[in-house]
Amino acid sequence: MQSFVHKIWYQGHPAAWLLLPLSLLFWLVSSLRRAAFRLGLKRSERLPVPVVVVGNITAGGSGKTPTVLYLIELLRREGWRPGVISRGYGASFDGELDVVAGMSPAQVGDEPAMIAMRTGIPMVVGRNRIKAAHKLLQCHDVNVILCDDGLQHYALERDVEILVIDGERRFGNGWLLPAGPLREGAWRKNSVNFVLCNGASAEADEYAMTLEPTGLVAVAAIHGKSQAKDNSHNAQDNATPRPGDTVNAMAGIGNPQRFFSTLMAQGFVLEKAHEFADHMAFSETDIATIDDGRPLLMTEKDAVKCREFAKQHWWYLAVDANLPPTFSTRLLDALNRAATAKQGNTHGL
């Protein structure tokens, strides 16, 4: 089903025309909603600390999570105290939930579980981003909030908007959901503060972002605490797959082919490359269908969901976002201006 949808969105399949009436309805509803905020019929809430929203305007993966991880590291290095709020897509909870490293994706969502495991950052998930932000401020000492995947959540006033684009697929056929991949029209690109192009060539008004592989990590080495300061499991040993080895691969993300292409670019020979649905809750049985004893490589997001039943020959490819220094400089300048406007000083150092 997922591959057929991608044919409609990105390969010009004629079935898109059958969905066009629904896209027109989607356009009408979303336009009225934006107009309600613009005219003051609905109110956006302003928070006492700067808010950075990271999102996209297409359905599926574009590189938001690596971007959030990059921002966390950047802000901590510069002396800020960041916290994260997220929708917690796919998780089962009521209200708002304080995320602790080691919580499962079923509890808090795929991306929050991965971010918490990697960084140990203060984080709250909730369907209502404003309530999540208030809980974050009440429970943690943070002075800047990163909103993961909140570009269309207009009830939350933001100081900086960062749009992440898949550089290869970009906006597909240019149509709104469900006939196309767009949550909002391509015009939205012109209203944000920063546009990051993940992969391929960036346009003149975009910052080029690449995802740099940093090595393979044993899935079985993931444990119930933050991995932020623990790199002992990254050491290469004789069992670690190396370029030229024949491996199997799996991915349950928005764009599995990007992951498979990355593995091949690293020199791995893919015997099997299996696509799972995005946000799939894996069981040991699911993996058994593709596991023939060869090294099995997966994404970090999938690894967090498979850690409870991981085998010794399962590995995930760790990646870090790489962005030009000009982006970091301009982002920090924007945050300092926002903090000054809100609090009469910079970031409280």
From Swiss-Prot:
Keyword hit for Nucleotide-binding: yes
EC number annotated for this UniProt entry: 2.7.1.130
InterPro entries xref list: LpxK, P-loop_NTPase
Residue spans crossing the bilayer: none
UniProt-annotated binding residues for ATP: T58, A59, G60, G61, S62, G63, K64, T65
Reactions listed under catalytic activity: a lipid A disaccharide + ATP = a lipid IVA + ADP + H(+)
Source superkingdom: Bacteria
GO CC list: plasma membrane
Coiled-coil regions listed in the entry: none
An annotated GO BP: lipid A biosynthetic process
Name of one Pfam family that matches: LpxK
Pathway annotation from the record: Glycolipid biosynthesis; lipid IV(A) biosynthesis; lipid IV(A) from (3R)-3-hydroxytetradecanoyl-[acyl-carrier-protein] and UDP-N-acetyl-alpha-D-glucosamine: step 6/6
An example molecular function term from Gene Ontology annotations: ATP binding
Disulphide-bridged cysteine pairs: none
Broad class of enzyme this protein falls into: transferase
Keywords for this protein: ATP-binding, Kinase, Lipid A biosynthesis, Lipid biosynthesis, Lipid metabolism, Nucleotide-binding, Transferase
NCBIfam families: lpxK
Protein family (similarity comment): Belongs to the LpxK family.
Function: Transfers the gamma-phosphate of ATP to the 4'-position of a tetraacyldisaccharide 1-phosphate intermediate (termed DS-1-P) to form tetraacyldisaccharide 1,4'-bis-phosphate (lipid IVA).
Protein name: Tetraacyldisaccharide 4'-kinase
The organism of origin for this protein: Shewanella amazonensis (strain ATCC BAA-1098 / SB2B)
